[in-house]
């Protein structure tokens, strides 16, 4: 890892506070534009709420660890940086509130219709694992529904003014459908309806997470272990861990306290052992999370682990939105191939 920005991303992106595992060099006052790039890159990683809060903490308590230069130049630069950071954070929170309100309306109508549906990822993770909507960025509403109830949910969405966006032919076999609606203040609202969180058929042969598996009454319904499986499968199969947020989701859920036996059972049922191992290992390596490390150890032996840890490194994840990201794509595709070899249900 060569970019100072990446070190500060890792240092400032833990919602629980400053990450002591990373002590990057400060920026000289002439490098202040790079701190604006840091805010933008945090936005692309969807970790800006934590970064802005921790940035403020550093600038108040130890500004010389972040910026060096004459005090009369640093003070106005700090003020401008914090003003932009707080403005961006306010926009992130405002959109999260709009999306959460949309999700609540949808879930109320779905419940009245008796539909088997669960709110997943975004607003659910924010409220269940992050401590509130202000602590996690998300850009849409995600609903997981039993396949045979999808048409009825479509009727609910259409009744609220949402329009179905037909997928391109090459994506017709995916288990995700998009619905959109214009909002007077928040642009376009996107709702993604999933019948299986593993969207592509080539990966779905090896792993799967349906509504009934996620919200299994025999395992206590939607538990922290269920959310951790959700976070790992989503980060791995949909995005190949191309944002820090997918690691932080696992980090925050692991901190809730996880029943290791339940986690192992759910991982086997869904085929998620390798994605889960990747998520936990990265949370331990990047953020030093002991809970993640302990859970990772309970999964051993992990199929293809020696190959996996060399492909999906901490540096790869932290660099995934930087200027060299295109050079990293071949390694991500290798990881995707590995997911098809490591059938966790075997």
Model-derived regions, located:
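Conserved NTP-donor binding/palm subdomain of two-metal-ion nucleotidyltransferases/polymerases, i.e.
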Residues: 1-139, 145-346
């Amino acid at each position: 890892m060569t970019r100072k920005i990446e070190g500060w991303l890792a240092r400032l992106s833990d919602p629980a506070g400053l990450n002591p595992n990373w002590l990057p060099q400060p920026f000289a006052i002439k490098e202040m534009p790079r701190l604006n790039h840091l805010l933008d890159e945090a936005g692309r990683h969807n970790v800006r709420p934590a970064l802005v809060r921790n940035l403020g903490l550093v600038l108040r308590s130890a500004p010389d660890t972040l910026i060096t230069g004459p005090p009369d130049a640093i003070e106005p630069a700090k003020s401008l940086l914090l003003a932009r950071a707080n403005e961006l954070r306010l926009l992130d929170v405002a959109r999260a509130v709009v999306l959460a309100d949309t999700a609540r309306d949808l879930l109320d109508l779905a419940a009245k219709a008796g539909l088997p549906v669960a709110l997943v990822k975004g607003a659910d993770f924010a409220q269940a694992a992050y401590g509130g909507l202000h602590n996690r960025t998300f850009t849409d509403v995600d609903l997981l529904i039993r396949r045979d109830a999808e048409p009825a949910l479509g009727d609910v969405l259409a009744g609220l003014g949402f329009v179905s966006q037909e997928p391109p032919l090459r994506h017709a076999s995916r288990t995700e459908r998009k619905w959109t609606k214009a909002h007077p203040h928040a642009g376009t609202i996107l709702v993604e309806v999933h019948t299986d969180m593993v969207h592509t058929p080539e990966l779905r042969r090896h792993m799967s997470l349906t509504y009934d598996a996620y919200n299994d009454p025999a395992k206590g319904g939607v538990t922290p272990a269920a959310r951790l499986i959700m976070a790992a499968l989503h980060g791995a199969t949909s995005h190949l861990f191309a944002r820090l947020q997918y690691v932080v989701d696992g980090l925050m859920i692991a901190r809730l306290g996880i029943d290791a036996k339940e986690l192992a059972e759910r991982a086997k049922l869904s085929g998620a052992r390798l994605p889960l191992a990747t998520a936990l290992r990265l949370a331990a390596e990047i953020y030093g999370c002991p809970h993640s490390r302990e859970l990772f150890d309970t999964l051993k032996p992990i199929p293809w682990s020696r190959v996996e840890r060399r492909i999906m490194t901490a540096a790869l994840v932290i660099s995934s939105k930087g200027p060299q990201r295109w050079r990293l794509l071949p390694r991500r595709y290798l990881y995707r191939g590995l997911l098809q070899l490591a059938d966790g249900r075997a």
